[in-house]
UniProtKB/Swiss-Prot annotation:
Domain of life: Bacteria
Enzyme class: transferase
Record-given protein name: ATP-dependent 6-phosphofructokinase
Its EC number(s): 2.7.1.11
Length: 319
């Protein structure tokens, strides 16, 4: 293999730049040319493809976002559109592709693989919802951003004796909410993977108030439902002074943590190794702190699951 491509797709995550850097430097170390595909699959279709050199990835390992930009591209689901993308890759002499992104990005890589073009997926999403890996690039940074925000909100919640409902990202996965809620001692954590009873939430808050608790923190993953509606329900049922904070896209930004920089470097380099070895149609990950790779089609057939033990622990510690 003499030439590979790299793109980032879907929602950005801190550490994507570190992964791009690793792909470029690892490939050049092995005398392989690297071409960057800008704006994800949309850029692949339009041919926005440029050669990357060592200097192209200098001074980016510590930066959030993605140097290659990103975009969502629903039209890539069309086989004819994907063929246009493959034609662009072949036009530029690209023999293998590294795709950095989340579930939708993996779906695109899977489809390209099924159409005969070798791809390797690298998990880049703050949601931590990709099968085949314990952690995704960006999750740790986002988690620390959320924890810092909740720490600050708890300060004002304590001062004003208020209940705060804090919404974090996670349409289908509650990892950010669960980990942040546990780390910050939240009184209640609501995640998409686990059903909840609003009356039970109310009862828990009232029990806390009866034993002298003056403030509470409730962490809600966005996939559970409207945090605003939850906050209104709590205030109406308890008369507690209640506020709602939606953290939003601040969770996606910022300089990546050391853990995300190292993880991205390891996974990006491993993706190149797989392409060099002729092992396309794979996705890389980390499990028990060891690099692993899986068949991307088989990996996508799996479903992300929450850590049940951690969820149970969060309930036991929030009595």
């Amino acid at each position: 293999m003499k030439r590979i491509g790299v793109l980032t797709s879907g929602g950005d995550s801190p550490g994507m730049n570190a992964a791009i850097r690793a792909v470029v430097r690892k490939a050049i170390f092995h005398d392989i040319e690297v071409y960057g595909i800008y704006h994800g699959y949309a850029g692949l279709i339009s041919g926005h493809i440029e050669k990357l050199e060592l200097g192209s990835v200098g001074d980016i390992i510590h930066r959030g976002g993605t140097k290659l930009y990103t975009a969502r591209c629903p039209e890539f689901k069309d086989p004819e559109v994907r063929l246009k993308g493959i034609e662009q890759l072949k036009k530029h002499g690209i023999e293998g592709l590294v795709v950095i992104g989340g579930d939708g990005s993996y779906q695109g890589a899977k489809k390209l693989t099924e159409q005969g073009f070798p791809c390797v997926g690298v998990p880049g999403t703050i949601d931590n919802d990709i099968p085949g890996t314990d952690f995704t690039i960006g999750f740790d940074t986002a988690l620390n951003t959320v924890i810092d925000a909740i720490d600050k909100i708890r300060d004002t919640a304590t001062s004003h004796e208020r209940t705060y409902v804090i919404e974090v990202m996670g349409r289908h996965a509650g990892d950010i909410a669960l980990w942040a809620g546990l780390a910050d001692g939240a009184e209640t954590i609501l995640i998409p993977e686990e059903k909840y009873d609003m009356e039970d939430v109310i009862a828990r808050l009232k029990r806390g108030s009866e034993r002298g608790k003056k403030h509470s923190i409730i962490v809600v993953a966005e996939g559970v439902g409207s945090a605003i509606d939850i906050g209104k329900h709590i205030e109406e049922a308890t008369s507690f002074d209640t506020r709602v904070t939606v953290l939003g896209h601040v969770q996606r930004g910022g300089s990546p943590s050391a853990q995300d920089r190292v993880l991205a470097s390891r996974l990006g380099a491993r993706a190149v190794e797989l392409l060099i070895a002729g092992n396309g149609g794979r996705c890389v990950g980390i499990q028990n702190n060891k690099l692993v790779d899986h068949d991307i089609i088989e990996a996508l057939a799996q479903k992300h699951t929450i850590d049940k033990d951690m969820y149970q622990l969060s309930k036991e510690l929030s009595i």
